[in-house]
Regions:
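Noncatalytic, solvent-exposed loop/strand surfaces
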Residues: 1-178
Length: 178
């Protein structure tokens, strides 16, 4: 081991990190509400271990996507875990991550409405591994209250002239129907 990075108290990961372009990139789990520190995906320089960037899966006040949480204070925003490793697409220079549900599960217990989408919960996010900037996102289940956990593996593949990202649960369901 060349270096270590401690995760915030109460957080952890059940999968390993990914390596891309001189970075080690890791998601986390244990992202309950009632704490200021929210879940994030972070990248570290492979040589020094210094943090290169951090992307919050539950946006902080003023960040893009924060308006989708209504006026809920940060302390009461929870979820956005990424406990399954992301994937890296070297052709597009993007990492793809599945993000879990908002917490608590029921939108009413979050004092939100069905119009409050709670980004980036239940989403696939595509991040630039060099900067951590969001390239795009797709929310599979906006404002959901059933603990769907859309944190599945994300894989890139080609179909004719298109580059597609496949959501792990969709592939599994498709295979079971054949």
């Amino acid at each position: 081991m060349v270096w270590d990075v401690l995760m915030p108290d109460g957080r952890g990961s059940s999968s390993g990190p990914i390596a891309a372009r001189g970075k080690i990139i890791q998601g986390m789990g244990g992202c309950q509400q009632y704490v200021e520190m929210k879940c994030f995906i972070s990248a570290y320089d492979t040589t020094t271990g210094k943090q290169a960037w951090r992307f919050y899966t539950v946006p902080r006040q003023g960040e893009p996507g924060s308006e989708t949480w209504g006026n809920l204070p940060m302390t009461f925003r929870g979820g956005g875990d990424t406990w399954i490793a992301g994937s890296y697409d070297p052709d597009l220079n993007l990492t793809y991550w599945g993000v879990s549900q908002a917490k608590p599960w029921n939108f009413l217990s979050r004092k939100l409405t069905l119009l409050d989408k709670t980004l980036y919960a239940n989403s696939t996010v595509a991040l630039n591994p060099d900067t951590g900037k969001l390239a795009w996102h797709y929310q599979h289940a906006p404002a959901e209250s059933f603990d769907l956990d859309e944190v599945f593996e994300e894989g890139a593949w080609d179909r004719a002239a298109e580059r597609l990202v496949e959501h792990g649960a969709i592939r599994e369901a498709t295979d079971q129907l054949r």
